A protein has these predicted regions:
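C-terminal motif of bacterial Sec signal peptides marking the signal peptidase cleavage site
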Residues: 24-25
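Short, conserved catalytic or interaction motifs in soluble domains
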Residues: 28
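Polytopic membrane enzymes that build or remodel cell-surface glycoconjugates and lipids
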Residues: 19-20
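Bacterial N-terminal signal peptides that target proteins for export
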Residues: 2-15
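Beta-propeller-forming repeat regions
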Residues: 31-34, 40-53, 58-524
Length: 524
């Protein structure tokens, strides 16, 4: 018996070492779907007898962080997430009859395997493990007894009056400080300008598709990024254009065939004294994070990260070597915050600063010194719920990861918010401590009034007082911008309305594309 136990102990030790080495190799090597499948093929040829938990660590960990069963309820695992994962590994069963996947679901080759990379018996063990360990329901977010709805001393809500009958489908907001105008784009392929003084429409132009980002040029005109297709899609119809003036005739498309781009940034990445463009091509099953080299022959694409889900990037010289480095939020599968350290001449070294599980739902971030220690921290919201698991998740919310000075980040603040979508970090009360504004596009609809906007006022170092705004009613907000709208020296907030109900309404109501929160905080 002692000999048997020794042999079993040695076997278990070998299995554990194999799992550790395998997971490490996955995190180091897997850069795209092809490499994921190569890893899975190596797994399929193994004959180790593993438990469902051990198998999940290996198979699920091949493509992303291994999600524990506690992240989703039993029914969501059973009916949605697990079947899709099985199909991606090429294991097709009779349950898939009539289900669109692979090419039938607009997925290009390489997303869903064309051969099985997992044995049925191994899959059965993984499925049984998840369904046995998953809760029937996820825990609810407890009510915050300190949440304050008395916001009268903070912001005055202004709803612009607009007689136009148009759906509220705002995709872009940007305040032009010099012009004193608000630029607004919507899903109906139009770009508007609003007066900052009375919030009235001045003019508009037709554009090729829904806009996602804009940058005003020093000498006039602007750069514009359009998505091509706003809904989840692998079509490469997005465009980067330069407008010399606010006219639908005065523009040049500098780069087309972009895969659902949602954000751009600008910097000279290869030290040729030309401004290059950093693109977050969010995509769907496919996409990438890349940069366009501004060369004499046009803008040449250079790949940085070949995975979909790039949401937003920030340019910063992280190591103080005079070169522009990049920080990007990746929000699909291998979710996380990645830094790309410029190695000169446009080459980058990847650093994974933060990693999240694949149902985390990262949606927005900023890189700013929150605790006034001289080091820039990561402020992040997660709440994307337009996926395979559209249930209320108690781990959605606002997080602050403090920088220890060596770019090692520790979560130091968390406030749960269902469906947190976007954030603004700004010292709105000018007390020296940055505050945070958060919108939620996927709030708990059973919790009335909706918590679709929350304001976190930093009273002291990392001490926040949270305010709700019941007056904002049941509107849905997808975008947010800041700017001194009324010229009083204080930053105001603009919320961009996006509500499909207004698109399909039998009788269209008045157009309410945005709401202004006028800053009324007394400056001491």
């Amino acid at each position: 018996m002692r000999f048997y136990r020794s042999i079993k102990s040695m076997y278990n030790f070998g299995v554990n070492v194999f799992i550790i080495l395998f997971i490490f190799s996955c995190s180091e090597k897997s850069k795209n779907n092809k490499e994921d499948f190569e890893i899975l093929e190596g797994l399929r040829n193994q004959s180790l007898e593993l438990s469902g938990k051990e198998l999940s660590e290996m198979y699920c960990g091949a493509c992303h962080l291994n999600p524990p069963p506690s992240l989703l309820d039993k029914n969501t695992w059973k009916t949605s997430v697990l079947p899709d994962m099985r199909r991606r590994m090429g294991l097709i069963t009779e349950d898939d009859f009539g289900v669109a996947f692979g090419a039938d679901a607009d997925a290009p080759p390489g997303v869903y395997a064309t051969q099985s990379y997992i044995k049925q018996k191994d899959w059965d063990l993984i499925e049984a493990y998840y369904l046995d360990q998953a809760p029937e329901n996820l825990p609810a977010i407890p009510k915050d007894p300190d949440l304050d709805s008395d916001n009268s001393d903070l912001f005055k809500i202004s709803v612009p009056e607009n007689p136009n009958k148009r759906a509220n489908l705002t995709t872009l907001l940007k305040w032009h400080k010099k012009e004193g105008l608000l630029y607004l784009g919507d899903r109906a392929n139009r770009l508007f300008r609003f007066s900052g003084s009375d919030l009235k429409v001045l003019d508009s132009i037709k554009i090729s598709s829904p806009p996602s980002d804009i940058r005003f040029r020093m000498g006039g005109g602007f750069d514009l990024l359009t998505m091509g297709v706003m809904d989840p899609s692998n079509y490469s119809l997005g465009k980067y254009s330069i407008f010399e003036a606010f006219s639908q005739e005065a523009f040049v498309v500098k780069k087309d065939s972009l895969t659902r781009p949602v954000h751009f940034a600008f910097a000279d990445l290869n030290q040729d004294n030309e401004e290059d463009v950093i693109l977050s091509n969010f995509g769907h099953h496919v996409g990438n994070f890349s940069w366009l080299e501004n060369s004499p022959t046009g803008f040449q694409a250079n790949l940085i990260n070949n995975r979909p889900g790039a949401r937003k990037s920030i340019v910063s010289d992280i190591n103080n070597d005079g070169l522009s480095d990049l920080i990007v939020l990746m929000t699909q599968a291998k979710e996380g915050v990645y830094a790309y350290i410029n190695q000169d001449n446009g080459k980058f070294k990847e650093e994974n600063w933060l990693s999240f599980h694949p149902v985390f739902g990262s949606s927005d971030f900023d890189f700013v010194d929150v605790d006034a220690d001289g080091y820039r921290d990561i402020v992040l919201v997660n709440g994307d719920n337009a996926d395979l698991s559209p249930i209320l998740k108690p781990y959605h919310g606002l997080r602050i990861f403090l920088n220890d000075g060596d770019y090692s980040f520790k979560e130091s603040y968390f406030y749960p918010i269902h469906g947190a979508t976007a954030l603004l970090v700004e010292d709105f009360d000018q007390n020296g401590n940055p505050d945070v504004a958060v919108i939620s596009y996927f709030p708990d609809t059973n919790n009335q009034p909706l918590q679709n906007f929350l304001f976190f006022r930093q009273m002291d170092k990392m001490t926040f007082k949270t305010f709700s705004f019941p007056e904002l009613g049941n509107w849905s907000y997808l975008t947010m911008e800041k700017g001194d709208i009324n010229g009083d020296g204080k930053m105001d907030i603009i919320l961009g309305g996006f509500d499909f109900k207004t698109l399909y309404a039998k009788t269209p109501g008045n157009w309410v594309p945005f709401v202004v929160l006028e800053n009324k905080i007394a400056i001491e």
